[in-house]
Amino acid sequence: VTSITLDLVNPTAGQYSSFVDKIRNNVKDPNLKYGGTDIAVIGPPSKDKFLRINFQSSRGTVSLGLKRDNLYVVAYLAMDNTNVNRAYYFRSEITSAELTALFPEATAANHKALEYTEDYHSIEKNAQITEGDKSRKELGLGINLLSSTMDTVNKKVRVVKNEARFLLIAIQMTAEAVRFRYIQNLVTKNFPNKFNSENKVIKFEVNWKKISTAIHGDAKNGVFNKDYDFGFGKVRLVKDLQMGLLMHLGKPK
């Protein structure tokens, strides 16, 4: 299993960007391009199913498991308050045997299936967000926020609300930043501060498949055949979307 690590002790914007680029380069098919663009495209599913992301702080490491063929989160690993490694997983996404290969530090007895599902809506419900529209948007983003939410699951008694909030931030700071350079750039621009998220970020996140499909099927030389609106105004030039990684949709059209 490939591991990619982000050091959160004294990170720089450059280190964060190169961490995001490493994930992108690791899962892309270097020979695949869609719509006459040079945007990275995820490679086809292979035997190598998972990618391990490590967040290192001065108090220890918390790890995330992502599916290589779509970057969906499948599990995370953290020490509990007695310094025992525990792996928590979404049971529809990964088997116990695969979890052992991904996080060998946690014994099978210390595997726990999460009581909710891996979609944003379910995680948000468990994060108990009371502000605004009660979505992940209300939590904000940023490297300091990633560090502080990671601290709530690192060497602590498990609290579902804290765990869900950590997952919401960690998913966006890894998988979503890899998919969308727009999000990656917001993080580096505000680095290392927490910043308010915006509707455009959420629109990107929920439209990854739609955007990938439009670029794959309806763009030539980086120009769409018609105007597209993904929730933040009309777009004709693919580059205006600042995409980082497209979904695997087979051969180019």
From Swiss-Prot:
Role according to the record: Ribosome-inactivating protein of type 1, inhibits protein synthesis in animal cells.
Annotated catalytic residues: E176
Biological process per Gene Ontology, one example term: defense response
Disulfide bonds: none
Enzyme Commission number(s): 3.2.2.22
UniProt keywords, alphabetically: Hydrolase, Plant defense, Protein synthesis inhibitor, Toxin
Any one Gene Ontology molecular-function term assigned to this protein's record: rRNA N-glycosylase activity
Catalytic activity: Endohydrolysis of the N-glycosidic bond at one specific adenosine on the 28S rRNA
Coiled coil: none
Enzyme class, spelled out: hydrolase
Name by which UniProt lists this protein: Ribosome-inactivating protein saporin-9
UniProt xrefs under InterPro entries: Ribosome-inact_prot_sf (IPR036041), Ribosome_inactivat_1/2 (IPR017989), Ribosome_inactivat_prot (IPR001574), Ribosome_inactivat_prot_sub1 (IPR016138), Ribosome_inactivat_prot_sub2 (IPR016139)
One Pfam family, short name: RIP
Family membership noted in the UniProt record: Belongs to the ribosome-inactivating protein family. Type 1 RIP subfamily.
Tagged with keyword Cell inner membrane: no
